Regions:
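TPR repeat positional signature
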Residues: 150, 188, 222, 229, ...
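Amphipathic alpha-helical "lid/sensor" segments that cap RecA-like P-loop NTPase cores
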Residues: 1-66
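C-terminal leucine-rich, beta-strand-based interaction scaffolds used for sensing/assembly
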Residues: 62-216, 220-223, 227, 247
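Residue at a conserved register position within TPR or TPR-like alpha-solenoid repeats
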Residues: 195, 229, 236, 279-281, ...
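Polyanionic, low-complexity intrinsically disordered segments
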Residues: 188-189, 285, 313, 349
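Residue-level recognition of tetratricopeptide repeat
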Residues: 184, 218-219, 225, 263-270, ...
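Alpha-helical repeat scaffolds
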Residues: 128-132, 165-178, 202-213, 239-262, ...
Length: 357
């Protein structure tokens, strides 16, 4: 329903994120007039040898990278043609690109992305690898204006949500970046997540442990490592392979410690969501009811959300756990949980919000 509160909030939120008035108008009007215009515009420029460079800019824009350093654009262009000239490219595509000192910005990115598909994984991988290699920090802990380009270009979550690459192609992308990016822990976290979603749990564990050796106190690293152990354990249990219970319990204990650790309090909601959701999945995979101690721990963590703003995903999880308790003779846990569940939701989030960044 486009007129529901949830739909209106999503539209307003998206418009506020736009830095391009045409993209904002496109989003708010469903964009058909703009789309028709730029479809004709793309057709007119279809034979242009610089078209792949424009496509590369659109792929990066879908990951939240709207502005690029001029030398990076030149590198991307020279991969397509040794004769590539940035000034000529800007002149040809002045409708959709502009240059400020040192940087090139893509405009109409949202519209163009709807017209330019993701059916060239080779070009997409090439583009993202070029961006990552150009923008990779010189050393761990260094952050400058290019760091966000590096992080967005290899973010598994962003790439999956954008629909640019399959999970197997994401792994291929990161395998090609090990040598130039191996000194940065963020790379190893993404490499680990990519291995995990491809079912390569041992590789994922190795990559994430390497990241932890570089940043032992990072929430992102510790959360990803604990989550991998739990997912790995459930995979083993569902396939009747190895000691899945041991793997899962090790990860669950680590996630619980993260959840109750005060220094990670800003990310409490993510830890609780992962811990409780995975225990419910464990119960389903093993066809075993949670023991009373585990159920009490889950309930206690959820009850502490009383002091945190709720979103729709947390509300849904609390409701799911209440139903679980009611169906498995643990009704004494329900009254306190219902008090939390009755708190009005403060905001709406998509499912992907709780995926590891």
């Amino acid at each position: 329903n486009p007129f529901s509160r949830q739909a209106r909030e999503k539209i307003i939120s998206q418009i506020m994120k736009e830095n391009d008035i045409i993209d904002a108008l496109y989003y708010s009007t469903e964009g058909e007039p703009f789309q028709r215009h730029y479809a004709r515009w793309l057709t007119k420029n279809a034979s242009d040898t610089d078209k792949k460079v424009l496509y590369s800019l659109c792929y990066l824009n879908r990951l939240g990278i709207a502005a690029l350093p001029n030398p990076l654009v030149a590198k991307i262009g020279q991969l397509q043609s040794r004769e590539f000239q940035l000034s000529s490219f800007v002149k040809k595509y002045s409708d959709v690109v502009s240059v400020s000192p040192g940087w090139l910005r893509l405009h109409r990115g949202r519209i163009l992305s709807t017209l330019i598909g993701a059916n060239d994984p080779e070009l997409i991988i090439q583009t993202l690898q070029q961006a990552a290699i150009y923008a990779v920090p010189a050393n761990e802990g260094r952050h400058d204006e290019r760091t966000s380009i590096f992080e967005r270009a290899i973010s598994v979550k962003r790439i999956r949500n954008s629909g640019l690459l399959s999970k197997n192609d994401i792994l291929t992308l990161l395998e090609g970046l090990e040598s130039p990016c191996k000194h940065v822990s963020y790379f190893w976290v993404q490499f680990g997540i990519a291995a995990q979603i491809n079912g390569e749990f041992e590789d994922a564990s190795n990559h994430l442990r390497y990241a932890k050796s570089m940043r032992p106190h990072s929430y992102q690293v510790n959360h990803a490592l604990a989550n991998n152990e739990m997912v790995w354990g459930i995979h083993l249990l569902s396939q009747n392979l190895g000691d899945g219970d041991s793997k899962f319990l090790h990860g669950a204990e680590a996630m619980y410690e993260i959840a109750v650790d005060g220094k990670f309090s800003k990310s409490y909601r993510y830890s609780v969501h992962s811990y409780v959701r995975m225990w419910l999945e464990h119960s389903k995979a093993t066809n075993r009811i949670l023991n009373k101690r585990t159920a009490q721990q889950c309930a206690a963590l959820l009850e502490k959300l009383f002091d945190h703003p709720l979103d729709n995903r947390l509300s849904s999880l609390i409701k799911q756990f209440i139903t679980y308790c009611e169906n498995h003779e643990m009704r004494e846990l329900v009254p306190s949980l219902k008090k939390v569940y009755k708190i009005p939701e403060r905001f709406h989030v998509e499912k992907e919000t709780y995926e590891i960044e």
